[in-house]
């Protein structure tokens, strides 16, 4: 179990914010989005938060229970027409909540933009405004990085369930993994995110490697980008300016 981790991943503003992020990846009308895959991604995200021992608000667990209800009703055999109508209503109500939150968030962002424009004429400096925008952009991209790791961790869980082999426990430290990653990026300046985990089969090693990567990103030693929707995340070692 990993303790004393100083890295904090900026959380979503709430469960609806997370769901909106997941739904937005499909780039289609909210009410046309396939809901079951979204629910599965949400539940994987919640499980990964627990695995990384990151703080998780109770509202996320409440939403998780509601989503599990919808998913279970989807998987159950059709009983009556009323059952189908009730399930569809639950799904519609959820998507309506997400859509309403989307409108609220757009309005909030518009108001924030107006506030920043007005700040040009008052006390806030141009440098401060640019810094704020950079942080917001980085946080949004970091969420995609975290979700990508969630998928890797979920795949590893499935492999453990299918494998009855007992493996002796090993200890992995963030410091060791930082050293290992630095060596890798010295030899190979650019690599795929998934390549960092392709040869790792133990959950503790996966988690420790991810935490080490976050430390390198936090210290601006490594940058990352995603060229297209659902595309591969690319990691690149940053040159240290003297």
UniProtKB/Swiss-Prot annotation:
Any one cellular-component term (Gene Ontology): cytoplasm
InterPro entries: ScpA, ScpA-like_C
RNA-binding keyword on record: no
Membrane-crossing segments per the record: none
An annotated GO BP: DNA replication
Highest taxon in the source lineage: Bacteria
Localization (cell): Cytoplasm
Keyword Membrane in record: no
Gene3D superfamilies, A to Z: 6.10.250.2410, Structural maintenance of chromosome 1. Chain E
Keywords of this entry: Cell cycle, Cell division, Chromosome partition, Cytoplasm
Subunit annotation: Component of a cohesin-like complex composed of ScpA, ScpB and the Smc homodimer, in which ScpA and ScpB bind to the head domain of Smc. The presence of the three proteins is required for the association of the complex with DNA.
HAMAP family xref list: ScpA
Family membership: Belongs to the ScpA family.
Known function: Participates in chromosomal partition during cell division. May act via the formation of a condensin-like complex containing Smc and ScpB that pull DNA away from mid-cell into both cell halves.
Protein name: Segregation and condensation protein A
């Amino acid at each position: 179990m990993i303790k004393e981790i100083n890295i904090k991943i900026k959380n979503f503003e709430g469960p609806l914010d997370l769901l909106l992020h997941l739904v937005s990846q499909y780039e289609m009308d909210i009410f046309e989005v396939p809901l079951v895959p979204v629910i599965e991604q949400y539940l994987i995200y919640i499980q990964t938060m627990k695995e990384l021992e990151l703080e998780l608000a109770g509202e996320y667990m409440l939403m998780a229970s509601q989503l599990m209800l919808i998913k279970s009703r989807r998987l159950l055999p059709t009983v009556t027409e009323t059952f189908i109508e009730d399930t569809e209503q639950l799904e519609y109500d959820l998507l309506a909540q997400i859509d309403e939150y989307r409108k609220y968030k757009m309005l909030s962002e518009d108001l924030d933009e107006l506030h920043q424009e007005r700040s040009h004429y008052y006390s806030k400096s141009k440098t401060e405004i640019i810094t704020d925008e950079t942080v917001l952009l980085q946080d949004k991209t970091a969420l995609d990085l975290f979700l990508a790791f969630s998928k890797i961790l979920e795949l590893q869980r499935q492999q453990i369930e299918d494998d009855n082999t007992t493996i002796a426990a090993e200890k992995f430290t963030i410091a060791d993994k930082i050293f290992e990653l630095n060596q890798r990026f010295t030899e190979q300046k650019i690599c795929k995110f998934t390549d960092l985990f392709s040869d790792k089969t133990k959950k503790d090693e996966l988690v420790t490697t991810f935490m080490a990567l976050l430390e390198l990103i936090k210290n601006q030693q490594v940058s990352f980008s995603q060229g297209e929707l659902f595309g591969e995340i690319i990691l690149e070692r940053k040159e240290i300016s003297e």
